[in-house]
């Protein structure tokens, strides 16, 4: 269940459910529409959570290729999930759990296990009712303790994979009070060559949805510009909804502006009225405005960051991008992320690194592109360029230091080179006997102890931090003494595991790496300390002396 320091949950309201479906094509932005709705409801004083339904047969997203699917987002309990849950955590400022991600693989696995154990007492196990009942159970359990639960159904209406979920939603609406259920459908409204907004794709999508037994209460048109009134009226007429239930969600440069745009259209007020909770909302002058203040502030400069990785898909590093953006919001600067392909570290990419104010090497798996990452780290270290290494970036910083400072030319990670004579990065002891790939790494939130009077202690404002992990390998203890004697300080650790490295301020203005993924806990209103410190170093402030009040998590 999502947890926060304080909750506004009012059991007298009962639970409200908002289901968000999509039509015409995938990738329309259902998740951002749903998250923006949740953000506005939270601003109005309601306790909000979310559920993402992914109709694939994978149990989780842990074994999916980031190049095809985008990043694997890690939750505090170790759940490896779709990147949309990252958007929900960032927009709603909550911590979610693996129970908030429903996949076909997880649902079928659970039902089959129950059948094998005899729980169904010899009955024929079918999609209806057994699979649909399990889907409904998962939604209700995830919603416990919240006023509103927003459920996003992945994929597009009409996809065969999604049919059991839409049937479960139809049953769900039949079982709950009418005032407790709201269906939002997000569709594409394209322009014709003559500049006319076309409604036919939306009409057909709603027709498909209605054929399943679902009637949308709200329609959100994804478009390059706002829907004009004629378009809204036409959609309302043919889709059988009031004109005031048709909303625009036009393209924007920054997704954090979407809540403000749909608020201007009155989406939040309409939702509250339909769910019969408008009278329970905070007065407008008492609602949370920090989000608006942050995303509409006038910036006072810009910073260029080189992100050195091997995946061409921007979504593969979404949380890193967002964490850099959050740090920019805190320091009141625009952050321009320059992509540097670590597989093609030629003169062109070297020039891009030289032009950058800082270098970030993110996480990843596999040998492809690692030599380019090592070269980028060497360049940052030798030229006093502020540097942040994350997970694999942390490990490659150890490899780079071993090679170029300790003169261990063949040093490497045992994950990437099984025959290396100097495995400065080696497999975690508990991983030796594990054969399965999915869900078997060191995952989720773990506490790291931090040495006093270090850069890490200054950034985190104390002698410990709790961040999320996703790795099988760690620094080889046999090399720690030699590395530290040569100037590489391991300032954060969990028992005998090294989890933060840094260089002393007299050796480098800002050089830090983390075995964990601080980007997964970064929020627009609470930026991640290592990312804030990176910008501090670029802007000329000494992150080694920044106070806790200036950089807080």
Swiss-Prot record:
Q: Where does CTP bind?
A: 26, 159-161, 198-203, 234
Q: State where the protein is found.
A: Cytoplasm
Keywords, A to Z, come to: ATP-binding, Cytoplasm, Glutamine amidotransferase, Ligase, Magnesium, Metal-binding, Nucleotide-binding, Pyrimidine biosynthesis
Q: Which GO terms describe its cellular component?
A: cytoophidium; cytoplasm
Coiled coil start-end: none
Q: Where does ATP bind?
A: 27-32, 84, 252
Catalysis: reaction(s)? UTP + L-glutamine + ATP + H2O = CTP + L-glutamate + ADP + phosphate + 2 H(+); L-glutamine + H2O = L-glutamate + NH4(+); UTP + NH4(+) + ATP = CTP + ADP + phosphate + 2 H(+)
> Which positions in this protein are listed as binding L-glutamine?
364, 392-395, 415, 472
Q: Which GO terms describe its molecular function?
A: ATP binding; CTP synthase activity; glutaminase activity; identical protein binding; metal ion binding
Q: Name one GO biological process term.
A: 'de novo' CTP biosynthetic process
**Residues reported to bind UTP:** 26, 198-203, 234
The segment(s) forming the Glutamine amidotransferase type-1 domain are 307-544
Q: What is its EC number?
A: 6.3.4.2
Pathway(s) per entry: Pyrimidine metabolism; CTP biosynthesis via de novo pathway; CTP from UDP: step 2/2
Activity regulation summary: Allosterically activated by GTP, when glutamine is the substrate; GTP has no effect on the reaction when ammonia is the substrate. The allosteric effector GTP functions by stabilizing the protein conformation that binds the tetrahedral intermediate(s) formed during glutamine hydrolysis. Inhibited by the product CTP, via allosteric rather than competitive inhibition. Inhibited by 6-diazo-5-oxo-l-norleucine (DON).
Family classification: Belongs to the CTP synthase family.
UniProt-recorded name of the protein: CTP synthase
């Amino acid at each position: 269940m999502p947890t926060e320091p304080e909750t506004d949950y009012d059991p007298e309201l009962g639970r409200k459910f908002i289901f968000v479906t999509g039509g015409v094509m995938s990738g329309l932005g259902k998740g951002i529409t749903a998250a923006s709705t949740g953000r506005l409801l939270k601003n109005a004083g309601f306790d909000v959570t979310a559920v993402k339904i992914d109709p694939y047969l994978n149990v989780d997203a842990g074994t999916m290729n980031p190049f095809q699917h985008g990043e694997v987002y890690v939750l505090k309990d170790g759940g490896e999930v779709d990147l949309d849950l990252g958007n929900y955590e960032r927009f709603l400022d909550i911590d979610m759990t693996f129970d908030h991600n429903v996949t076909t693989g997880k649902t079928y696995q659970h039902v089959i296990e129950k059948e094998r154990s005899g729980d169904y007492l010899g009955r024929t196990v079918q999609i209806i009712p057994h699979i649909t009942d399990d889907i409904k159970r998962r939604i209700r359990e995830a919603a416990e303790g919240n006023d509103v639960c927003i459920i996003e159904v992945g994929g597009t209406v009409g996809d065969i994979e999604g049919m059991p979920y839409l049937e479960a939603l139809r049953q769900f609406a039949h079982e709950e009070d009418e005032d407790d259920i709201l269906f939002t459908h997000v569709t594409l409204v394209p322009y014709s060559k003559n500049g006319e907004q076309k409604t036919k794709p939306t009409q057909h999508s709603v027709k498909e949805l209605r054929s399943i037994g679902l009637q949308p209460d709200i329609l959100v048109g994804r478009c390059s510009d706002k829907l004009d009134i004629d378009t809204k009226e036409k959609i309302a007429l043919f889709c059988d909804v009031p004109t005031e239930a048709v909303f625009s969600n036009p393209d924007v440069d920054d997704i954090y502006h979407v809540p403000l745009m749909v608020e201007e259209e009155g989406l939040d007020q309409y939702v509250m009225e339909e769910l019969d909770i408008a009278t329970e909302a905070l007065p407008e002058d008492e609602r949370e405005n920090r989000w608006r203040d942050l995303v509409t502030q006038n910036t006072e400069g810009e910073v260029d960051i080189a992100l050195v990785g091997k995946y061409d898909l921007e979504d593969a590093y979404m949380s890193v991008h967002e964490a850099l953006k959050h740090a920019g919001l805190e320091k009141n600067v625009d952050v321009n992320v320059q992509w540097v392909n670590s597989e093609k570290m030629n003169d062109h990419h070297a020039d891009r690194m030289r032009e950058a104010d800082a270098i970030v090497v993110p996480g990843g798996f596999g040998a492809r592109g690692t030599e380019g990452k090592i070269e980028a780290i060497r360049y940052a270290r030798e030229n006093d360029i502020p540097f942040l290494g994350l997970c694999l970036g942390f490990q490659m910083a150890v490899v780079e230091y071993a090679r170029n400072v300790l003169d261990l030319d063949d040093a490497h990670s045992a994950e990437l080179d099984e025959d290396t004579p100097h495995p400065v990065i080696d497999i975690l002891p508990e991983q030796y006997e594990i054969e399965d790939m999915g869900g078997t790494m060191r995952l989720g939130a773990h506490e790291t102890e931090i040495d006093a009077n270090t850069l890490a202690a200054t950034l985190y404002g104390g002698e410990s931090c709790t961040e999320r992990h996703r790795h099988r390998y760690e620094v080889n203890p046999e090399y720690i003494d030699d590395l530290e004697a040569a100037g590489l300080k391991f300032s954060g650790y969990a028992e005998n595991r090294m989890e933060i490295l840094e260089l002393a301020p007299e050796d480098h203005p800002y050089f830090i790496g983390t075995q964990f993924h601080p980007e997964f806990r970064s929020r627009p209103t609470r930026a991640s300390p290592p990312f804030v410190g990176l910008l501090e170093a670029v802007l000329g402030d000494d992150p080694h002396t920044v106070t806790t009040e200036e950089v807080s998590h």
